Regions:
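Short hydrophobic transmembrane-like helices used for membrane targeting/insertion
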Residues: 1-3, 18
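Basic polycationic patches enriched in arginine
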Residues: 4, 10-12
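Active-site beta-strand->loop->alpha-helix modules in alpha/beta enzyme cores, enriched
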Residues: 12, 16-204, 239-246, 258-269, ...
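A short acidic, often aromatic-flanked loop/helix-cap motif at beta-alpha or helix-coil junctions
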Residues: 148-152, 210-213, 234-236
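Short, flexible loop segments at boundaries between secondary-structure elements
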Residues: 199-219
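A conserved mid-domain beta-alpha-beta active-site/ligand-binding segment of alpha/beta enzyme cores
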Residues: 214-250
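Acidic two-metal-ion nuclease catalytic site recognized across multiple nuclease folds
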Residues: 278-280
Length: 280
């Protein structure tokens, strides 16, 4: 079945692919990747030769025959921001794929009377299911239902849960352990613990780091990094999967907050590749 964007999605298509504005705020020492506007522009990242020189890897190398891809997403939408293109390629090739949603993303609109935690608990998992269908994955995410915004206090509990869910033939993808978001980092630590104990392989993926890091930033493990090229179908499916997260794409009329997935985040999601940090 062909994937058709909703009218609002068509209006966002141009914004999804425009070049980043020259006036974007540069990352600084005090930059908060979550609450501060702007970040390192996509123009700056595109101008860095190191990004295009990363070793290339294909889906079959990342997830060899006889293994299963497991994506551990701290919040609904992280699975697509991390590896939406990879998931589309794996689904098309018939690979085994499983997504674990650590939280229901109920803390994305703090202080909002429009997007309350109760409403988000209903909406965001539904958005995630729709997004996975766009990628060709029919099995819904397994919801672990931990508390959004408090995973740093729950990473031991999360690690234990993951140990019961993964095995030695799994390739586990999750957010980078120094991504700048406490939930992302706690999830990565839990995944690192669980994969060591279960002898599974771990691949970490930066999400918020693109905001605060600079091209060539020595704080990122570039020596371990690789790049997964995305074909046209994977890019298209990833775009429509992002559009499923309407709660994250709209400004909050109650608080005046801008969309969680702002223009810079969307531009990064439109890249023809995904950058990954396989654990060494």
């Amino acid at each position: 079945m062909g994937i058709r964007p909703a009218p609002a999605s068509r209006q966002r298509l141009e914004a999804f692919s425009i070049a980043a504005p020259n006036a974007c705020m540069k990352a600084a020492n005090a930059f908060d990747p979550i609450t501060s506007p702007g970040g390192t522009s996509e123009e700056d990242w595109n101008g860095w030769p190191g990004l295009t020189r990363l070793p290339r890897v294909d889906a079959e190398t990342l997830v060899p025959a006889g293994t299963r891809a497991v994506v551990v997403a701290p919040h609904p939408d992280d699975e697509v921001l991390m590896v939406g293109g990879l998931l589309a390629q794996l689904a098309r090739k018939g690979f085994l794929v499983r997504v674990f949603a650590v939280t229901d993303g109920t803390a994305s609109h703090r202080g909002s009377s429009a997007w309350t935690p109760r409403l988000l608990r209903q909406v965001r998992p539904r958005e995630s299911r729709a997004a996975l269908r766009c990628l060709g994955i029919t099995e819904p995410p397994l919801r672990l239902k931990l508390q959004d915004g408090a995973l740093s206090k729950q990473h031991g509990r999360l690690a234990e849960r993951l140990c019961s869910l993964i095995g030695p033939h799994d390739i586990v993808f999750t957010t980078w352990r120094r991504d700048g978001n406490p939930d992302h980092e706690a999830t990565a630590r839990a995944c690192a613990s669980a994969t060591r104990r279960r002898r599974a392989r771990l691949v970490e993926v930066p999400v918020w780091a693109w905001n605060w890091a600079q091209p060539g930033d020595p704080r990122l493990p570039w020596r371990n990094a690789c790049s997964l090229p995305l074909d046209a179908d994977a890019k298209r499916r990833k775009f429509f999967a992002i559009q499923a997260y309407e709660s994250q794409l709209l400004p909050d009329e109650c608080t005046g907050a801008q969309p969680v997935l702002d223009a810079l985040m969307l531009q990064r999601a439109a890249r023809p590749f995904e950058v990954l940090f396989p654990a060494q």
